[in-house]
A protein has these predicted regions:
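Conserved glycine-rich cofactor-binding loop
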Residues: 8, 15-16
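Conserved glycine-rich Rossmann-like NAD(P)H-binding loop of the short-chain dehydrogenase/reductase
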Residues: 29-45
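Substrate-binding pocket helix/loop in short-chain dehydrogenase/reductase
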Residues: 99-100, 107-112, 205, 209
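Active-site helix of classical SDR
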Residues: 123, 161, 169
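Alpha-helical segment proximal to the catalytic Tyr-Lys
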Residues: 128, 174-178, 237
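Residue(s) in the substrate-gating loop at a strand-loop-helix junction
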Residues: 143
Length: 253
């Protein structure tokens, strides 16, 4: 079950964080990969690690997902290497954020471009490739903050971008429903990555989690990977437009 052998997955934001984690997870189920990010040296490291461990093919592609020209070049490279695309995992994201009273135009524009507009541009480009085979799985990484606000953090642009990801997912799912392509979103809560671990392991965060997360802890890597693997699989063929919170219950209270 959930075997991805023979599938080709494109993963953005693969140089670090959740993108890097998700690339490993899909490779572990047998998928060949095109891994996209701006830092190509980090992609080369991941390529060698994954190919050695899982025996799948990995194509590193330097790509700024906010730039249409970079994305078009990435599509050409992926089609040349693999001839098809089955799975698109939009993980790329970053934030230059502040509270609404202090945010600059540049902070807003950067966050929306990286976290939301990139999903539109990547999906437009790669869904056209998927349509050629009448098959595709698009998975967008949103956030629990795309579903709820959080007065404790000055992250207005981040909330707006991830809320946009939630609803663009639904719109894409409806539009492509008869094309063999599904589109779903995952809304992670607090998860440990190489970037978040220093914060999540602090006593302050542990106290915060006990107050705000019903399970009173942050998530583990495998708990998030499982959702992505399912949505990428053949078994998820009747699942589209779904918004899957994996957040320890944060959004249910």
């Amino acid at each position: 079950m959930f075997n991805l052998k023979g599938r080709v997955a494109v993963v953005t934001g693969a140089s670090s964080g959740l993108g890097r984690q998700m690339a490993r997870a899909l490779a572990g189920q047998g998928a060949d990969l095109a891994i996209l990010a701006r830092r190509v040296e980090r992609l080369e490291e991941l390529k060698h690690e994954i190919e050695k461990k899982y025996g799948v093919k990995v194509l590193p592609v330097q790509c700024d997902v906010t730039k249409t020209t970079d994305i078009d070049a990435a599509v050409a490279q992926v089609k040349t290497e693999f001839r098809k695309v089955d799975i698109l995992l939009n993980c790329a994201g970053s934030s230059k954020d502040a509270g609404i009273l202090d945010m600059t135009d540049d902070q807003w524009d950067f966050t929306i471009a990286t976290d939301l507009t990139s999903v539109f541009k990547m999906t437009r480009a790669f869904a056209n490739v998927m349509k050629e085979n009448h098959y595709g799985r698009i998975i967008n990484i949103a956030s629990m903050y795309g579903l709820v606000g959080n007065t404790a953090m000055g992250t207005v642009a981040y909330h707006a971008s991830k809320g946009g990801v939630v609803n663009i997912t639904r719109a894409i799912a409806a539009e492509l429903a008869t094309s063999g392509i599904t589109c779903n979103a995952i809304c992670p809560g607090y998860f440990e990555t190489e970037l978040t671990k220093p914060v999540l392991d602090t006593a302050e965060f542990q106290a915060f989690a006990k107050q705000t997360v019903p399970m009173q802890r942050y998530g583990q890597e495998g708990e998030l990977n499982a959702g992505a693997i399912f949505l990428a699989s053949d078994e998820a063929s009747y699942v589209t437009g779904a918004i899957l919170p994996i957040d320890g219950g944060y959004t249910c209270i």
